[in-house]
Amino acid sequence: MILYSLIGDISLSVYFIPWDVNQNLLLESERLYEKAETFSCIEKGDLVAVKLHVGELGNPSYVQPFFVHHIIQKIRAAGGKPFLTDSNTYYLAQRHNAYDHIQTALMNGFNMAPFIAADGLRSENSRIVKTRGILPEISVSGAIAEADAMIVISHCKGHDLSGFGGAIKNLAMGCTSRAGKLQQHRVVNLEIDQTKCTGCATCKSVCPNNLPEIVNKKAYITSPICMRCPICQSECPTKAINFLNKENICKALASAALGVIETFQKNKISYVNF
């Protein structure tokens, strides 16, 4: 596993350090930040969004707080005013609203700077931004669009739908409101092969919104609020649920990420990926 950082808007130099548990990774990352000029995007007095994923309550799979604390210290040393931020989830979970999101952040150890839910109490704070590609526009979370600079901290991992999730997905899904998330997910469709469906209702039981309907021992997904997440598809015991136009999700992620980037002036975003 590696940690790397890059500065700039879309594609500039990328710097790597080895993920070696026998080394002091804070000292190693210090040298990386200097080489990459990670914090050169910050000017004195800037309100700096520190975009991260605080993890689910009780789940340890997130960037550890001591790495984030180090980044917060570097931002303050550069004259910035950092705030931790992430957008509320579309699905019903512990991070579905700002109150529970903040509680989760605190319980998981993210208390070194104020935490602001990027899209407001119930995802009502957003801005429509023009973009390019498969999406003509995207709903960007208000606190992201209003920040002066941003450090994007991403935990890179595999993903059922997009294949891989890193900085682009962190921008695209993590910096957009619920409406923006739905815009991206709805570029794909779900299809149920009725010859394989047994009506077992596993899809309904695992769906965060309990959306699939079981009619005459067959499942149907017709709700307009279905966000085309991969949960039901991955849990179906007979593999009856399939995605159509699955390649569109990566195109939508790229469009949304570009829309987020364009709310900032040039060279006001840096990225640190784990």
Where are these regions (language model features)?
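Low-complexity, intrinsically disordered short segments enriched for Gly/Pro and polybasic residues
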Residues: 1-2, 210
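Short, Lys/Arg-enriched N-terminal segments with co-localized hydrophobic residues
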Residues: 2-11
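Extended, low-polarity segments enriched in aliphatic/aromatic residues
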Residues: 13-44, 49-52, 57-59, 63-66, ...
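Short secondary-structure subsegments characteristic of cysteine-rich extracellular domains
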Residues: 66-74
